[in-house]
Amino acid sequence: MNENLFTSFITPVILGLPLVTLIVLFPSLLFPTSNRLVSNRFVTLQQWMLQLVSKQMMSIHNSKGQTWTLMLMSLILFIGSTNLLGLLPHSFTPTTQLSMNLGMAIPLWAGAVITGFRNKTKASLAHFLPQGTPTPLIPMLVIIETISLFIQPMALAVRLTANITAGHLLIHLIGGATLALMSISTTTALITFTILILLTILEFAVAMIQAYVFTLLVSLYLHDNT
């Protein structure tokens, strides 16, 4: 079967159902019943991680910013889960699609900016013109600050897309090289296979780091506007 570098981005199906959907739904069968939630180790670990991330991100926010805690925690769990699911064999990573990442970044950025203009109108407008700017530079700086404001959601989406896509392509290329070298040089194939294993472990870390970075930047945008 002929394949190219982007074959892995095609959503696989089993019996007409998307494989990722089956993977996501299956763990729900293993969840503990409600009367065991208190003593369940998995739930305790999950709550500890959420509290740790929440403390790191929300400590800089005031009372108005704290109301976004649940949304930001849901965001980091969603992005982290989709990134990790993409590392499973024959699965698809939704965050490799720029359209999806823009669909997340634009509403979150717009919500933060609108909140800022509604609650702190003068302070939000002051960001477009730094204090002490020479009069001849005022029009240029206003244009530059406006462009930098509107480019923020694009930077969020492109950063996530590029990092996740680059890792998947590297895994595909090194995996293909390993298969090709097995019939040529076993020693070289073992070296490339070791590199592949290390790269895969690195991708697990990147998947979580990118989820954290995306959510942290949204949190910082929110902090600037609350």
From Swiss-Prot:
Catalytic reactions of this protein: H(+)(in) = H(+)(out)
Compartments where located: Mitochondrion inner membrane
A biological process from GO: proton motive force-driven mitochondrial ATP synthesis
Gene Ontology CC annotation, any one: mitochondrial inner membrane
Membrane topology: Multi-pass membrane protein
Pfam families: ATP-synt_A
Keywords on record: ATP synthesis, CF(0), Formylation, Hydrogen ion transport, Ion transport, Membrane, Mitochondrion, Mitochondrion inner membrane, Transmembrane, Transmembrane helix, Transport
Gene Ontology MF term list: proton channel activity; proton-transporting ATP synthase activity, rotational mechanism
InterPro entries, sorted: ATP_synth_F0_asu, ATP_synth_F0_asu_AS, ATP_synth_F0_asu_bact/mt, F0_ATP_A_sf
Highest taxon in the source lineage: Eukaryota
N-formylmethionine carried by residues: M1
Effect of S59N: In strain: 65
TM helices/strands, residue ranges: 9-29, 68-88, 97-117, 138-158, 164-184, 189-209
Reported function: Subunit a, of the mitochondrial membrane ATP synthase complex (F(1)F(0) ATP synthase or Complex V) that produces ATP from ADP in the presence of a proton gradient across the membrane which is generated by electron transport complexes of the respiratory chain. ATP synthase complex consist of a soluble F(1) head domain - the catalytic core - and a membrane F(1) domain - the membrane proton channel. These two domains are linked by a central stalk rotating inside the F(1) region and a stationary peripheral stalk.
NCBIfam families given in the database record: ATP_synt_6_or_A
Family statement: Belongs to the ATPase A chain family.
Subunit description: Component of the ATP synthase complex composed at least of ATP5F1A/subunit alpha, ATP5F1B/subunit beta, ATP5MC1/subunit c (homooctomer), MT-ATP6/subunit a, MT-ATP8/subunit 8, ATP5ME/subunit e, ATP5MF/subunit f, ATP5MG/subunit g, ATP5MK/subunit k, ATP5MJ/subunit j, ATP5F1C/subunit gamma, ATP5F1D/subunit delta, ATP5F1E/subunit epsilon, ATP5PF/subunit F6, ATP5PB/subunit b, ATP5PD/subunit d, ATP5PO/subunit OSCP.
UniProt-listed PANTHER family: ATP SYNTHASE SUBUNIT A
Descriptive protein name: ATP synthase F(0) complex subunit a
Organism: Bos taurus (Bovine)
